[in-house]
Regions:
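Bacterial N-terminal signal peptides that target proteins for export
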Residues: 1-7
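Short, surface-exposed coil-to-beta transition loops
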Residues: 213-215, 227-228, 340-344, 356, ...
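Beta-strand-dense domains in secreted/periplasmic systems and polymorphic toxin scaffolds
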Residues: 244, 358-359
Length: 435
């Protein structure tokens, strides 16, 4: 590139960054989107049910995938009150303290200057060609499960949606640890002795059934988003750890309808996708108070905890309430042309900036393949350990393959700030010694 062209390009990049810089008002708005009132829609009232008979009336406030499964008569949803999911003051304060320190680099997946908090709290702008990428960074450095947490158990059920037959049921445990950019739980701001410069790790272990018991998965994500994740699988019957090839994160996970890349809504790097912000609208998302839902003691938790019930066609749909939320519509197209999907559409909650409330997954032909939703409970209406944490609790999920008429559902018992999450749990050596 000639010097003049380089100068013009750098100038344009600088002007773009300046034009979309955040202000103190943006910080207030991003964490308090309902300060001036909750969204409304004609005919929508808390307590009502949206079903096949009336769904067309509410099509504009439903994610396309949600509309499809209701229109087919497979499920119906009950509308709840819109509520505030206030994030921890430590995260808000970190955002304010580090305002405008984070900048995008020249390539998708490049970020410099990020310390902690929400990196890009300004309202996304359709005129900003990288607005979608900024939202993706907000998700990566968001508070899905906080600095550290555990789910034990997560009950994963595989079903034939046409008949409701349970084909397989697994009991899993999941553990999450942020090594860097921590905002609340000691050690802050980072776990020491992190020579590999990891940002976050996920560790999973199968408890049941017996033929899969002690199968383990470890994902290590680097702070440098351009660096490929390290992923390892331990198969108990083989008693050996093997490293997963990159493409295996898009294989069916333990025979379910999920890929590893689907975890938490999206479990990949920012640089793995081309992100496009499609606009802001009000959409119904599954967000609720756990203690106010239809609950089941089917799984007989020894502590008396009751899980969100399933229902609808084939028992493929969680029985939680949905509330009208401000969302950012975000499209992600895989950079890898051999990826098994053509794109995902996320309806990102503007307050939490999580990606898992409502998602459509499209096949290589561009047709909807799966409808993916994770319902969140307000922490103050969940387990005592979660009260006051300010972390939306992933409470139940439904992954519905609308082409194959198959589903995978999940019920969580998640705990925030779980102390039995030592860094050693997230090392390969731990997998070998956990039999």
């Amino acid at each position: 590139m000639k010097l003049k062209q380089l100068t013009l390009a750098l100038s344009a990049l600088f002007l773009s960054a300046s034009a979309f810089s955040a202000t103190e008002a943006d910080v207030e708005a991003t964490f308090s989107p309902y300060k001036n009132g909750f969204p409304k829609a004609p005919g929508l009232t808390p307590g009502m049910t949206i079903n096949k008979a009336n769904v067309d009336q509410f099509k504009d406030i439903l994610a396309l995938g949600t509309y499809r499964v209701i229109k087919e008569g497979w499920t119906e949803i009950k509308v709840g009150n819109t509520t505030n999911f206030d994030l921890p003051s430590s995260y808000v304060d970190a955002t304010r303290k580090n305002l405008n320190t984070a900048k995008l680099g020249p390539n998708n997946g490049d970020i410099v200057g990020f310390v902690a908090g929400r990196p890009f709290p300004e309202e996304p702008d359709l005129k900003d060609p990288r607005a979608g990428e900024k939202l993706a960074w907000n998700y990566k450095y968001g508070l899905n499960w906080g600095d550290n947490a555990s789910i034990e158990p997560l009950t994963l059920t595989l079903r034939n949606m046409s008949t409701g037959q349970v084909e397989r049921r697994l009991k899993l445990e999941f553990h999450f640890l942020n090594f860097k950019h921590r905002i609340k739980d000691a050690p802050v701001p980072a776990v020491p002795d992190n020579a590999s410069n990891l940002f976050r790790s996920i560790y999973m272990k199968v408890q049941e059934p017996s033929d899969l018991k002690n199968t383990q998965l470890l994902i290590q994500r680097y702070d440098d988003d351009q660096k490929l994740d390290d992923a390892y699988l331990y198969l108990g019957f083989q008693r050996r750890v093997r490293r997963l090839a990159t493409g295996q994160t898009t294989d069916a996970f333990l025979g379910s309808d999920l890929m590893i890349e689907d975890f938490e809504g999206y479990n990949g790097r920012v640089s793995d996708m081309k992100w496009t912000y499609k606009g802001t609208k009000n959409v119904l998302l599954p967000m609720w108070n756990h203690d106010e839902l239809p609950l089941t003691d089917e799984f007989h938790d020894p502590e008396g905890y009751k899980f969100v019930a399933d229902g609808g066609q084939g028992n493929c749909f969680f029985q939680g309430t949905w509330q009208l939320r401000k969302v950012y519509v975000l499209e992600a197209v895989p950079v890898n042309p051999n990826h098994p999907i053509s794109r995902r559409t996320f309806y990102m909650d503007a307050q939490l900036q999580a990606l898992n409330g409502a998602i459509e997954i499209y096949d290589r032909k561009g047709e909807i393949w799966k409808v993916w939703s994770v319902g969140k409970s307000h922490p103050d209406h969940h387990l005592p350990v979660n009260k006051g944490t300010g972390i939306g609790i992933d409470d139940a999920f439904q992954m519905v393959d609308i082409q194959a008429k198959h589903c995978s559902t999940g019920q969580f018992k998640g705990k925030i700030g779980y102390k039995q999450n030592p860094p050693s749990l997230f090392q390969v050596q731990n997998m070998r010694g956990s039999d």
